[in-house]
Structures are given as structure tokens and as C-alpha cells.
């Protein structure tokens, strides 16, 4: 069975990717399961550049496997696209959700709800071999609330309000989120591209 390494140790992300790709007959594993300890510098100027760099650095170590990597983040119109590619380290420390959310709320203080438009963006790269890769992007639009609402999810989820559900991402069930999230949209596009290679069904 062909192996796909997910270039992440984020358990939430790994679970979401495995769930959406379960129709394919692949052994999908995390970096930890492969005993890979690597910290790739995300110095690209776009989400897709960072995703490709992460995937390729790991592919160079395990050329017998395929590698899937994503880079995702939040873009806020009022902040000219920030936090963007710096979403995970917006407040200075990588992955400090609480501090990142506090900084975002403070920058948007006084901005009316209708001007708090935001997008969650996810770029995914699957490196198949040295010459072939698939690149896809998913996006969902919403608004930034003025306080954290909900306890599910991670990252900016408690601040990202989805008009379609009248809830934040952190109030959605896993199934609801997987049906509309930026990562779900990108993964569905990835599935479509993979099926063209006769990997599915």
C-alpha cells in the first residue's frame, strides 16, 4: 500500500485530512509516526509556496512516499490581508492561539461588524514524485466577531463567524466544519485531482 506522509504533527489537521482522504487506499501517516523531526522555515511569500516547500523538504527524505503539506491562515480585509502567512505566529510565538486571537481582536477594536470581512485560506500540495505534484487552494468567507465564541476547533475558529450557519467555526460540529472549511474545500479539490489519476473508487 502506497504511503502518504502528512507534513504536520497537528492532530486536528491530521484527523481532518485522514477523514476526507479515507476513500483512497493509502496508508496515511504523520511525521511523528515516521520518526521525522524537521522544522521547515516557512519563508515563502504565499500559502502555496510555503506548502510546497514543506512537502518537498520531507519528500527529499522519503522519496519512496508521497507527501502532503498545507499552509493555511486567516486574511482580514480591514488589515490588508493580515495575518495571512503569519497567522500561526501573529503575536510572535508560533501556535499561541490565545495570544494570536487577542492581537487580532485588539487590531479590530472599534471596527463595525460589517467591515470585519475575513477569509480562511488553505493551500495544499501533494508531491507524488520528483516530476509530479498537485496544488490546490480552498477559501471560505466570513466575519471576525468581537469576542471568542464556542469551544470546538482551534486557532482563530472562535472568532470566525460563518453567516451560512449563524455560528463561529468553534460552534460547528466536526461534520459541519468538514463540509465547509477552507481545508475541506481544498481537500475536495485534491480528491478530484487524485481521482483523475484513477486512485479513487
Curated annotation (Swiss-Prot):
Binding positions (Mg(2+)): 41, 71
Q: What is the lineage of its organism?
A: Bacteria, Bacillati, Bacillota, Clostridia, Eubacteriales
Cofactor annotation comment? Binds 1 Mg(2+) ion per subunit.
Q: Could you tell me what this protein is called?
A: dITP/XTP pyrophosphatase
Q: Does the keyword Transmembrane helix apply?
A: no
Quote the function comment for this protein. Answer: Pyrophosphatase that catalyzes the hydrolysis of nucleoside triphosphates to their monophosphate derivatives, with a high preference for the non-canonical purine nucleotides XTP (xanthosine triphosphate), dITP (deoxyinosine triphosphate) and ITP. Seems to function as a house-cleaning enzyme that removes non-canonical purine nucleotides from the nucleotide pool, thus preventing their incorporation into DNA/RNA and avoiding chromosomal lesions.
Cellular component GO terms held in the UniProt record: cytosol
Record field: transmembrane: none
What are the positions of the active site?
71
UniProt keywords (A-Z) are: Hydrolase, Magnesium, Metal-binding, Nucleotide metabolism, Nucleotide-binding
PANTHER family recorded for this chain? INOSINE TRIPHOSPHATE PYROPHOSPHATASE, INOSINE TRIPHOSPHATE PYROPHOSPHATASE/HAM1 PROTEIN
> Pfam families recorded for this chain?
Ham1p_like (PF01725)
Amino acid at each position: 500500500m502506497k504511503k502518504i506522509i502528512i507534513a504536520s504533527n497537528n492532530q486536528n489537521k491530521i484527523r481532518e485530512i485522514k477523514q476526507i482522504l479515507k476513500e483512497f487506499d493509502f496508508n496515511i501517516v504523520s511525521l511523528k509516526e515516521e520518526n521525522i523531526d524537521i522544522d521547515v522555515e516557512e519563508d515563502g511569500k504565499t500559502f502555496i509556496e510555503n506548502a510546497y516547500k514543506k512537502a518537498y523538504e520531507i519528500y527529499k527524505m522519503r522519496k519512496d512516499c508521497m507527501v502532503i503539506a498545507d499552509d493555511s491562515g486567516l486574511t482580514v480585509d480591514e488589515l490588508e490581508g493580515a495575518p495571512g502567512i503569519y497567522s500561526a505566529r501573529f503575536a510572535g510565538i508560533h501556535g499561541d492561539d490565545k495570544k494570536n486571537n487577542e492581537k487580532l481582536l485588539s487590531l479590530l477594536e472599534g471596527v463595525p461588524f460589517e467591515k470585519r470581512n475575513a477569509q480562511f485560506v488553505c493551500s495544499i500540495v501533494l508531491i507524488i514524485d520528483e516530476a509530479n505534484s498537485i496544488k490546490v487552494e480552498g477559501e471560505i468567507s466570513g466575519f471576525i466577531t468581537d469576542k471568542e465564541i464556542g469551544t470546538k476547533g482551534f486557532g482563530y475558529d472562535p472568532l470566525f463567524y460563518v453567516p451560512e450557519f449563524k455560528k463561529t467555526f468553534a460552534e460547528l460540529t466536526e461534520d459541519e466544519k468538514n463540509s465547509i472549511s477552507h481545508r475541506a474545500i481544498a481537500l475536495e479539490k485534491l480528491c478530484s485531482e487524485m481521482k483523475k489519476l484513477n486512485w479513487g473508487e
